[in-house]
Each structure stands twice: as structure tokens, then as C-alpha cells.
Amino acid sequence: MKKIDKIINFMRILEEVCVVNRDLVLFDGTKENDAMHIFKLSFLVMLIAPYLKTPVNYTKLLELALVHDIAESKTGDYTAANQMANPSLKKEKQKKEQQAIKEILSILPFQLHKKLNKLYQEYEHKQTTEAKIVSVLDKLEANLQANQYKNGDVNYWKNCENGEEYYKIALEKKALV
């Protein structure tokens, strides 16, 4: 198969990210999907990067933001609240996502497969400063999203890691909206 055909096939699979719903309800009552989340995270990276005091590879920041949730096109989204309620779910998530990323990236030409897998693993294992920054921004984007709940309902965050803190922040911001 030609390289371009492999890339087109990969893009078809990537399309599935657009239909993976997250548990976040947007202000209009619809659910956020993974593609929306990745889009907003990528913008957050672009907006925050110029203000970082630590020297970073800006391109890598964006690449990490783009690849960090693509395995969910096969596994779906595992919510933080569900993982908190069921600790074994986190290991199940990691295992399924590793299988999914292997399957998804196998479609690509070797060099692209190798590059995207390296980025994905780097993010998952927080191996670099860039991966750690994107991970923090990923959580920040979710916190910002909490303020967009329909009717300002931010109770979801009470059940997440550091949820009480997120909940307090979200309630304070809700008062400003």
C-alpha cells in the first residue's frame, strides 16, 4: 500500500475521535467530544507556551496535545470520576489504550508510526518537560470546561482527583459568570 493511502486510512480512523463523547456537558446541553477537547487543549498550548519560563520545544508541545487522546477513538473516554470510584479501571484503561494505540498507528508508514508512538508514550509516561506541561494543561482545559456546564453545574469535579479544589475554584468562577 502506498504511503498516502496509509495516511488516508489513518485519517479515517482518526475521524472516530470526533464521535467519542466525554462526560462533560456543554453549556448548550450537548456533550463534548474528544476532538473538541484536543482542539481546545492545542489552543491552550499555543496561548500558554509564550509565557513558560522553562525552555521547551513548542512543536513537540503541540504534537503531544494532538496525540494524547487518539487511543480513545477505539477505547472511548474513561472519566476521572469513574477511575476514582474504581481504581482497577485505571489499569484497564492503560492496557486497552496501549493496545488501541498499537492498532491505530500500525496503519501508518513506519516513520510516522514510530514518531507518533514515541510522542504518545512520552505523554503517557510524562517522560519530558513538554509531556508534563501538556498533562497539566490537559487538566486545566478540563477545569476550564467545568465552568461551561449547562446551568453552571460543576458538581462533577467533587468526585475527581483534587476534586474538592476544582469544585471550589469552579464555584468561585461560576459566581463571576
Predicted regions and their residues:
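Alpha-helical, largely C-terminal catalytic domains
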Residues: M1-V177
